[in-house]
Amino acid sequence: SYEVGDLMILSDHINLIPNPLIGQNIAELGPRFPDMSETYCPTLIEKAETIAKINNIPVQKGVYIALTGPTLETPAEYKYMRIIGGDTVGMSTAPEVIVARHMDIPCFAMSVITDLGVPGKIKKVTHEEIQKVSEVAEPKLTLIIKELIASI
């Protein structure tokens, strides 16, 4: 159960944005059909969870769904995303991770829960409100990322 302001480590994603690898493949960068069975690096996830625990920062772990935006989701879209296995929704991250994995770069990602798409908790939200929630969560997120980078 997520709450506004929670941090979430991405364990996987569902990409509903056009795939950035569509088109001619550049073989020097990676294979035509890159494996995505381990999209997010388990070692980095484990290290981040340890860092969060040491610093008393609660984190969630879940599946991120990437959409094109720029609209926020409808209640029916939120329902659909829960049905297909998503925990959170955003308008970025997955395309960048797909490109990085194509190049065999280990990936790690986190999100801030800025609003809730759960029945009974869906409410009108503005971009400014989303930014405010993100600003409050930013110091915790930054601490985890800085310590994770230092541990590599």
Segments (PLM) and residue ranges:
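Glycine-rich phosphate- or other oxyanion-binding loops that anchor nucleotides, phosphorylated ligands
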Residues: 1-152
